[in-house]
Regions:
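A conserved structural motif in NAD(P)-dependent oxidoreductases
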Residues: 82-93, 104
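Short, small/polar-rich loop/turn modules that mediate ligand/substrate recognition or access, typified
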Residues: 45-50, 108-110
Length: 122
């Protein structure tokens, strides 16, 4: 699982008025995951093992690593950045994971499937 912060810099405005703070190390780790998955795909392809990642936008629910839910201010700030004006439901991200596990995606490897309601296109 990856994040749009692995392909774009963080938008600090989405944290304004919330108790959340941006974490620059998070972007570094997620960007590294993009490259790592491509390198793994280039090696393991010879064994017919496919390696892909999901790059998700914000997901409705709890804050990662916390029992706290996202504040309404964060959801409002975040939603303004997406074409669909909302965060993803967990099952919407899960559908991408399922797709990549199916035979219908058997020729896909080394890819980062972006599921972000258009955030990365802005």
């Amino acid at each position: 699982m990856n994040s749009i912060y692995g392909i774009l810099g963080q938008d600090l405005n989405i944290y304004k008025g919330t108790n959340m703070e941006p974490n620059p190390i998070y972007s570094l780790i997620k960007g590294g995951l993009n490259t790592f998955s491509k390198n793994m795909a280039s090696y393991y392809g010879q064994y017919s093992i496919r390696i892909n990642t999901i790059i998700s936008g914000g997901i409705e629910g709890h804050i990662a690593g916390s029992k706290n839910k996202q504040s309404s201010k964060f959801k409002s700030n975040y939603s303004k950045k997406t074409f669909l004006k909302r965060l993803a439901k967990p099952q919407e991200i899960a559908r991408g994971v399922v797709f990549l596990s199916l035979d219908k995606s058997s020729y896909i490897t080394g890819s980062n499937l972006v599921i972000d309601a258009g955030w990365s296109a802005t």
